[in-house]
Amino acid sequence: MFRIVRLVALLASAACAAPAARAAGNWVTDAPDFPSSPLCGSGEVTLWTCTAAHKTFSLCAQGGVAAQDAAIQYRVRDRSGKIVLRYPEPMRAPRSAFSYECSANGDAEVDFSIGKIGYALVDPLRDVSFISVTKGDKELAHLRCAEGNQSLQLNDTIALMHALGVPAPH
């Protein structure tokens, strides 16, 4: 029995382990696996997108040949089509702007803060994605995405976050 429990724990922890053979320069090997978003440009990859509360929320990655050339930006578009938020602005290396975690149960999330407001883009392995907006310990908003996602658990996303040195939340 102990062996089975240990094996299950080992397999679960491997679910979000970064592929060792990838480099930031070739991190998109399966571009069709990523969602698409009108908020991300033609030279960018949509790492994550969500439609909720008549808005579109996307995490766009701009790849470079080297890790220091890559950047990630969170964007929000309102119902009129206007981009109302870009973070970080200007776009820069993600290690100073975001944190990333892929847990043993397969859930993954990207966290960041703008001032005293915290944002969590959450991709549960077995449920629909959502955005949690907090201030201190109080949740200000919980936006459930209209579509499923699970793109934060893709091997390419995991490899990119690790290659770029995006830290785990503290």
Predicted regions and their residues:
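Bacterial N-terminal signal peptides that target proteins for export
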Residues: 1-8
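Bacterial N-terminal signal peptides
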Residues: 8-16
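Sec/Tat signal peptide C-region and signal peptidase I cleavage site
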Residues: 19-23
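N-terminal secretory signal peptides
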Residues: 24-93
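Short, surface-exposed beta-strand/loop "edge" segments at domain boundaries and coil↔beta transitions
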Residues: 56-58, 78-87, 117-122, 128, ...
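Short polybasic amphipathic segments
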Residues: 69-78, 110, 128-135
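Short, structured surface segments that line ligand/substrate-binding pockets
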Residues: 99-132
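C-terminal partner/receptor-binding element of secreted or periplasmic proteins
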Residues: 136-170
